[in-house]
């Protein structure tokens, strides 16, 4: 797991010393500013860090926010040999990665993910993105110099954020038997905070796949399990439905497609999601959801591409007939 560090904030000075950055800027949001920024800055004081604070929320993951950050970096004299640290959840890590990859054609990037979702998914693997008429329509692939995964952040997370990230862990469980068996031993969502073994297993699954296919030309697409439907649900809700909750619903639909095509037991997915209190019913009209799925960067030649589970530990990436998708959406709406 090169570049992925499991530790506490006291490791930050050594991480930065190895880079010798010209300037250090911490990008965070209004919520994290009150909760964690002061402590992080204390550990970075020898590097004289500056900060950029943006509003909290998925709807701010757009070009306006990126433009604001670019302008602030220019004002600060930020250079290619300077370090941008993204301190926050998936929105912040996505924005920080995109800004770092585009500003002066690439600067140093470090990520300190503060949510379960970011620690197991958004901050891992080098994907960056902003929303533009759809989820992550504009983005790059750009690897950070480091990702610091600190369990202390999870201890202060509200339950809604634990659940938001747990959906991605369940996704890894469908793709990997070892993660699936570990999840089955959990009795409540908050157990994940103390189960660093499950977090490490989830990260390892993603890294193993990403190392084979960084730029998502082939195998990496399996990590989009639940996301073709999930992104459509987020879009229809105007991002009022959190990413993990949308992915949870997407996992159910795509599991049902697997059931139709391959006899996959979708009940296993529904059972785990229900045990943790994650949503399994689609709240929107199936046809509306289907149309939203067509505005998707994973589409091939205008065709909807789905990650279809065949069995626990195995999934196919394939075009799926719209009639089958509608059938699965209907079943999930009435589940």
Swiss-Prot record:
Keyword Cell division included in the entry's annotation: no
Keyword line: Amino-acid biosynthesis, Aromatic amino acid biosynthesis, Cobalt, Cytoplasm, Lyase, Metal-binding, NAD, Nucleotide-binding, Zinc
A single GO cellular-component term on record: cytoplasm
Residues reported in the UniProt entry to bind NAD(+): 56-61, 90-94, 114-115, 127, 135, 153-156
Pathway: Metabolic intermediate biosynthesis; chorismate biosynthesis; chorismate from D-erythrose 4-phosphate and phosphoenolpyruvate: step 2/7
InterPro entries, per database record: Dehydroquinate_synthase, DHQ_synth_AroB, DHQ_synth_fam, DHQS/DOIS_N, DHQS_C
Gene3D superfamilies xrefs: 3.40.50.1970, Dehydroquinate synthase-like - alpha domain
Domain of life: Archaea
EC number assigned by the record: 4.2.3.4
Residues that, per the record, bind Zn(2+): 168, 227, 243
Cofactor note: Binds 1 divalent metal cation per subunit. Can use either Co(2+) or Zn(2+).
Cofactor: NAD(+); Co(2+); Zn(2+)
Protein's cellular compartments: Cytoplasm
Function: Catalyzes the conversion of 3-deoxy-D-arabino-heptulosonate 7-phosphate (DAHP) to dehydroquinate (DHQ).
Stored NCBIfam families: aroB
Official protein name in the record: 3-dehydroquinate synthase
Species this chain originates from: Pyrococcus furiosus (strain ATCC 43587 / DSM 3638 / JCM 8422 / Vc1)
